[in-house]
């Protein structure tokens, strides 16, 4: 983005401040926890709000997994000519707010304090839903774009995203794009806008260890009889050395991080590491 473009965009976005606050106030008013029977209607209201909101910025919204408790949406416009397509991601479900008495304000009433806005989901991830809407309104005000746009809005991210996983397997063509921007990460520090260019991957692996034909009594066989649970513990423990450094054959651990640095003391404070406890992987 050029300096000239930023100069054009900034006043448009700033001029939307009241609209952005209103949008965020509305969507955070829904206690849209997925998978809680007594909150099904709240989740459904949030889903309906999302669909209407993205239609209001000129995108065609298609609902998927309608027969599940957590429908997801793809709001889109086609690319013009050979223009690339951008896939944007966010989600409208939240986690439980916990004990309301521990909040400084009602978790479902957006509240401004010291220049920051507070409510359940204001950051993760309803603020990012509203951010996409504000950006799309700004694009429209600037005359539109030739880019193809797809916005994926998920309804069960906090519960593992089973509905999205199923759709990706069944309809991979829906997610075809030249670039993907996931609006569900964080900043390097408060007030420091951050672009995350890669994310940690994950894999779910089932490992089964068998050592005995049948369970036996520990009073008679304990000690000498090989314990499958103990074997699994030793297996997992072998992944790291005594300082927490990864030691798995084939995994390159010599790379140096070139992005924003995370001061160790700040990390300790943010993570709540107790005094006297080492940060994993840092000792020589």
Residue ranges and their predicted role:
Residues 15, 19, 41, 45, ...:
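Conserved active-site and cofactor/substrate-binding residues in soluble primary-metabolism enzymes
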Residues 83-150:
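Active-site metal-coordination/substrate-binding segment of hydrolases
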Residues 126-143, 161-169, 226-238:
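Active-site-proximal alpha-helical scaffold in enzymes
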Residues 69, 155-159, 253-256:
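Short, internal active-site loops enriched in acidic
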Residues 146-227:
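Histidine/acidic-residue-rich, glycine-tolerant segments that coordinate divalent metal ions
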Residues 18, 29, 55, 141-144, ...:
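Generic secondary-structure signature for well-ordered alpha-helical cores
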Residues 2-100:
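N-terminal helical capping/dimerization or prosegment-like subdomains
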Residues 218-284:
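Acidic-enriched catalytic cores of C-N bond-cleaving enzymes acting on peptides and small amides
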